[in-house]
From Swiss-Prot:
Entry keyword set: Cell membrane, Glycoprotein, Membrane, Plant defense, Transmembrane, Transmembrane helix
Residue ranges of coiled coil: none
Native organism: Arabidopsis thaliana
Protein name: NDR1/HIN1-like protein 10
Locations listed in the record: Cell membrane
Recorded name of the encoding gene: NHL10
Biological role: May play a role in plant immunity.
Membrane topology label: Single-pass membrane protein
Disulfide cross-links: none
Amino acid sequence: MAAEQPLNGAFYGPSVPPPAPKGYYRRGHGRGCGCCLLSLFVKVIISLIVILGVAALIFWLIVRPRAIKFHVTDASLTRFDHTSPDNILRYNLALTVPVRNPNKRIGLYYDRIEAHAYYEGKRFSTITLTPFYQGHKNTTVLTPTFQGQNLVIFNAGQSRTLNAERISGVYNIEIKFRLRVRFKLGDLKFRRIKPKVDCDDLRLPLSTSNGTTTTSTVFPIKCDFDF
């Protein structure tokens, strides 16, 4: 075997590939974009809330909307009889109810007006009044009349109350109005709302055949208006 020859010069072997370049990576770049978008979204929402709040304040300062006012100024109860065992309630009740629009710039469209009569929590009559438009600073007088008969079943406690009030000649009757109203400001008409009006403190004396009453009652009675 021939002896190995020492290397007298440089060794030229296969070329060694250069090291791969290190990738450039910005830590948190994707997260930073998400935070920026979220921050921008929050700023836009806050700006919209502030703009709407300022617009609502300006609108209120200019228009100064006020609640509609309902009062019962007169009532005539000429019949209120409940018979058994058929449980028929016969009634005749007429009311005078002025409705006041105190607003200077807002008109009101009463698209639907329902009046409900209750005794001891039992509804015994419902009527629908004629729709109308009410202008600025205007009073419109409603005259709902409940007349007829209906099946009304009272429990023992309600029957005792009815008997006691029959003896006294004064009946505690509730009138509730359910409305559909639109507001008009200039040429603009706003969406329909459904306010509720409750006239709960009506202690009405039964009128006698000669037109007198068994006891007196105090008018006007203010009704509760709730949007």
